[in-house]
Amino acid sequence: MTDLVYEQPLNEKIRSYLRLEYLSKQLCNNLNNDHQHRCFYPLFSLCELSERCDYRNEVLKDIERNLLQLSKWQELEHIDSKQITFYIEALTQARESLQRPERCGNQLKQDRFLSALRQRFGMPGACCNFDLPQLHFWLAKPWDERRQDYQAWVSHFEPLLTPIALLLQLTRSTADYAKATAHAGFYQGDSTQALSLVRVKVDAAHGCYPTISGHKNRFAIHFVQFDQQRHSDRSIEFLLATCA
C-alpha cells in the first residue's frame, strides 16, 4: 500500500488556505477531465466562500510578510538562491494581480447561466433536464468548448488561488518529515515556536488514520483503526512534519 498524508491546520488562516487549495485542485482536475455536471460543485463552493469572506487583505499581508523573510534569507550563505528568487518573483507577480479593486469571482454573479444553475445545485436531484434545460444544452456541447467556458470561469479566481498555492508551499517547506512513533496509538508534541500546520505521513497498511488536534504550541495525534472505528492500542510508526 502507499503512504497517505494528513494535514491539520493550527490556525484559522491556514484552515482557510487549505480549503481553497482543495477546491483549486478539484478545479484543475475538472479542466483535465470531463466530469459533466459535477464540475460545477467546486466552482460554486468557491463562489460561496469568496462571497462570505474577502481573503485578499489577509493574503496580501501574508505575501508581504513572506517577501520580507525571503529577502532576509537571500543574504545568508549556503542558501538556494535560485529557489528564493523564484518565490520572490512569483509572490511579487501574484501581489500585483491580487491588488485589483474587485473581489475575485464577483463578475460571475452577472452570469445568468451560472446563477440559474447555482440556485438549483443545492437541491437533491435537481440536475434533471426538466429542471435545468440550459445545463442539458451545455453538456451536449463538445468537451473542448465546455473546457474553454470552464477555464474562463476558473480564471476569475486565479489571482487568489495562485498566491495561496505559493504560500502553502512555503509553509510546508519550513519542516522536513522525521520518524515518530505513536505508542498505544497516541502521540503528543509541543514546540517553542508557533506552529501553523501539522503533517502526518503514515502507511495505509497500518489500517488506521490519525485524528489531530492542538494549537500553535502543542498538538496531539490519536490513531483510529478504520475497520473498528475506535482508538488503536498498537504502536504506530509514522513520519511527522511540524510547520511554522
From Swiss-Prot:
Compartment(s) of residence: Cytoplasm
Biological-process GO terms, alphabetical: division septum assembly; FtsZ-dependent cytokinesis
Signal peptide as annotated in the record: none
Claim: Ubl conjugation is one of the keywords in the record: no
Keywords: Cell cycle, Cell division, Cytoplasm, Septation
InterPro entries with a match to the protein in the record: ZapD (IPR009777), ZapD_C (IPR027462), ZapD_sf (IPR036268)
Keyword Oxidoreductase recorded: no
Matches recorded under Pfam families: ZapD
GO cellular component term, pick one: cell division site
PANTHER family assigned: CELL DIVISION PROTEIN ZAPD
NCBIfam families in alphabetical order: PRK05287.1-2, PRK05287.1-3
Quaternary data: Interacts with FtsZ.
Protein family membership: Belongs to the ZapD family.
Function: Cell division factor that enhances FtsZ-ring assembly. Directly interacts with FtsZ and promotes bundling of FtsZ protofilaments, with a reduction in FtsZ GTPase activity.
Name of the protein: Cell division protein ZapD
Organism lineage string: Bacteria, Pseudomonadati, Pseudomonadota, Gammaproteobacteria, Alteromonadales
